[in-house]
């Protein structure tokens, strides 16, 4: 959880942090390709293991002559001693230690105005240091780092698997009659040529067969699609580059992409592919077929206490998985949680998780808070507030899907543009849990202005639902449930800020946190006809469902009319966006060497 603090400007050793990220990537590759189990080997063991695996390839070392190195002490055959790109250049090995012990192996070029190397690091000016700690520079440096790691490991992996295929083919070929050998060799060579061509082919929109639309947002659309060669079912998000540039959303999209590529949790939606063309960018994510939690909540009204507790448990685990990656969501809503085929939830939509809100957004929220100073909010009972919210949902389908959006679940310090930490996500989850048990959000009003006013005066508005009417007695809260929500919806200094605090609260005393996905059957399990069943999403051929997106389409039309009057995004605006998820492709039998080509391995982050 401490990694959440990384969202602030970096004050420590940036080179060491980037080297740590490279180390994770390095270990992931080795484990994925079956070369070693990262946790069980030391760095020296890893180096020896790699040498054993790749020595038989008889690779010629690149730039191996001594004159290519500033000092003879730098020459090393170990892969883990290769220099890693970093905004603060250092000779770091995989463990983060200095690989080159000679403190004077770099020439002093300070007289020319260029940076000077000393004690293994570069002395930078104040202006250069300011650039180094910028989030954009950090990201670009990491992209460069990952690119070279991906490139060379994929090259080594290709050579290794090609040799394995050739060996298996030769073994099987000896068992075949002479009359068939020429034909089999020809087929083998043909497969290898196809394999090489496939490695050079860029992924494109045409590689996917769209099935039906399942979502629509202010900046793009989401489609259920099938990848033509692998038959993978994905949710393909398509966003226009010019629109993103005009609305200053490029950083948010890149943040979402970075989170998805980093995430390796059962609680977070997985990214399978990310690619782009001249007009659009594409995110192909795993398809979660059960719809979003908003739909489930709207159809259910009020959840029973043990059902609400189950979903709250999974939501806290999901947001903790995001926090452990070093990100804050800040804008959690029921729509951000999707229900999987098994009934368990996954967190998605990380576009605003960068930890940086644009000045325009902050200013607009401050203005909204000021505008509601004179708004007269009528006193309403809990029963009236629940009825108002349910009426709005039934009569105005746009209400819960507004592009502008009301701040029902957003912490006050975020709205005011003040400093905040990851506890703002616990505020949001407290609001969602309140809605699960009450049937309406704690600060909802009959209109958006009333909601803003309620949030500004949240201490007065936040009340425990209590019902005396016999028809509503079942909606009364348990004391431990109310106490828990009060620890989420409160001032930052008193608010829960860690999963450990949540787990230790009496309300969750009987929850088996380590085995939630196996120990409990979800209250709702989607009834699916096939892997491409999109029945739990809006039908975009239905006029009633499309009415929810009237405001979305109006905003898109307004943006489209404005886009041409502004400069287009720079060509490098989306650099480092491309991604393919990893899949093993080791040969398993000698017969496969003759009968079928191996599927091409997928690539990691590519420029």
From Swiss-Prot:
Residues 589-607 have a biased composition (Low complexity). The modification Phosphoserine is found at residues 56, 60, 65, 86, 402. Residues 93-108 have a biased composition (Basic and acidic residues). Residues 509-589 form the AGC-kinase C-terminal domain. The modification Phosphotyrosine is found at residue 219. InterPro entries: AGC-kinase_C, Kinase-like_dom_sf, Pkinase_C, Prot_kinase_dom, Protein_kinase_ATP_BS, Ser/Thr_kinase_AS, Ser_Thr_kinase_AGC. The active site is at 331 (proton acceptor). Its EC number is 2.7.11.1. Pfam families: Pkinase (PF00069), Pkinase_C (PF00433). ATP binds at residues 214-222, 237. It comes from the Eukaryota. It catalyses: L-seryl-[protein] + ATP = O-phospho-L-seryl-[protein] + ADP + H(+); L-threonyl-[protein] + ATP = O-phospho-L-threonyl-[protein] + ADP + H(+). Residues 208-508 form the Protein kinase domain. Residues 93-118, 586-607 are annotated as: Disordered. GO terms for cellular component: cell division site; cytoplasm; mitotic actomyosin contractile ring; mitotic actomyosin contractile ring, intermediate layer; mitotic spindle pole body; Sid2-Mob1 complex; spindle pole body. Residues 109-118 have a biased composition (Polar residues). GO terms for biological process: division septum assembly; intracellular signal transduction; mitotic cytokinesis checkpoint signaling; negative regulation of protein localization to medial cortex; positive regulation of G2/M transition of mitotic cell cycle; positive regulation of mitotic actomyosin contractile ring assembly; positive regulation of mitotic actomyosin contractile ring contraction; positive regulation of mitotic spindle elongation. GO terms for molecular function: ATP binding; protein serine kinase activity; protein serine/threonine kinase activity. Interacts with mob1 and cdc11. Part of a signaling pathway. Required for initiation of medial ring constriction and septation. Belongs to the protein kinase superfamily. Ser/Thr protein kinase family. This is Serine/threonine-protein kinase sid2.
């Amino acid at each position: 959880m401490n990694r959440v603090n990384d969202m602030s400007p970096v004050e420590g050793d940036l080179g060491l942090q980037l080297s740590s990220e490279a180390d994770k990537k390095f270990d992931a590759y080795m484990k994925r390709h079956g070369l070693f189990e990262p946790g069980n080997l030391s760095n020296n063991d890893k180096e020896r293991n790699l040498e054993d695996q790749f020595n038989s390839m008889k690779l010629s070392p690149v730039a191996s002559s001594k004159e290519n190195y500033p000092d003879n002490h730098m020459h090393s055959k170990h892969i883990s001693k290769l220099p890693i790109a970093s905004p603060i250049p250092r000779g770091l090995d995989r463990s983060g230690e200095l690989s080159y012990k000679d403190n004077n192996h770099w020439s002093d070029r300070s007289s020319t105005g260029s940076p000077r190397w000393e004690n293994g690091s570069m002395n930078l000016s104040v202006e250069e240091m300011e650039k180094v700690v910028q989030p954009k520079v950090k990201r670009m440096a990491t992209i460069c780092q990952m690119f070279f790691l991906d490139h060379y490991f994929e090259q080594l992996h290709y050579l290794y698997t090609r040799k394995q295929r050739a060996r298996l083919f030769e073994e099987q070929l000896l068992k075949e009659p002479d009359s068939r050998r020429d034909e089999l060799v020809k087929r083998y060579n043909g497969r290898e040529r196809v394999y090489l061509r496939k490695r050079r082919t860029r992924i494109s929109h045409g590689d996917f067969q769209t099935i039906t639309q399942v979502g629509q947002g202010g900046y793009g659309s989401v489609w259920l699609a099938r990848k033509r060669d692998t038959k993978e079912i994905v949710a393909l998000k398509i966003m226009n580059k010019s629109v993103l540039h005009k609305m200053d959303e490029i950083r948010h999209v890149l943040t979402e992409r970075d989170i998805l590529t980093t995430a390796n949790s059962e609680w977070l939606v997985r990214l399978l592919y990310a690619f782009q063309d001249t007009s659009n960018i594409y995110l192909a994510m795993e398809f979660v077929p059960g719809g979003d939690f908003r739909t489930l909540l709207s159809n259910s009204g009020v959840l029973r206490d043990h059902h609400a507790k189950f979903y709250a448990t999974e939501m806290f685990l999901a947001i903790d998985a995001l926090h452990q990656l070093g990100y804050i969501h800040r804008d959690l809503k029921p729509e951000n949680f999707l229900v999987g085929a098994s009934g368990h939830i996954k967190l998605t939509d990380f576009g605003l998780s960068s930890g940086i809100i644009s000045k325009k957004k902050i200013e607009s929220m401050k203005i909204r808070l000021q505008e509601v100073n004179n708004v007269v909010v009528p006193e309403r009972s809990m029963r009236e507030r629940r009825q108002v919210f349910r009426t709005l949902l039934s009569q105005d389908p746009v209400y819960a899907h507004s592009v502008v959006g009301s701040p029902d679940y957003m912490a006050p310090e975020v709205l005011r543009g003040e400093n905040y930490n990851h506890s703002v996500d616990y505020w949001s989850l407290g609001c969602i849990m309140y809605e699960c048990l009450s049937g309406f959000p704690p600060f909802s009003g009959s209109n958006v202005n009333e909601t803003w006013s309620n949030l500004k005066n949240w201490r007065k508005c936040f009340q425990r639902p209590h019902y005396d009417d016999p028809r509503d007695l079942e909606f009364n809260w348990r004391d431990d449930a109310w106490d828990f929500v009060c620890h989420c919806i409160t001032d930052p200094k008193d608010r829960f800020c860690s999963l450990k605090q949540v787990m230790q609260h009496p309300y969750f005393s009987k929850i088996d946190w380590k085995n939630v996905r196996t120990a409990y059957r979800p209250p709702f399990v989607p009834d699916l006809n096939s892997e491409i069943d999109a029945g739990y999403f809006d039908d975009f051929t239905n006029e009633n469902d499309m009415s929810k997106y009237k405001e979305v389409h109006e905003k898109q039309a307004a943006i489209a009319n404005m886009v041409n009057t502004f400069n287009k995004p720079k060509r490098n605006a989306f650099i480092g966006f491309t991604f393919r998820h990893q899949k093993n492709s080791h040969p398993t039998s000698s017969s496969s060497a003759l009968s079928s080509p191996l599927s091409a391995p997928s690539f990691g982050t590519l420029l």
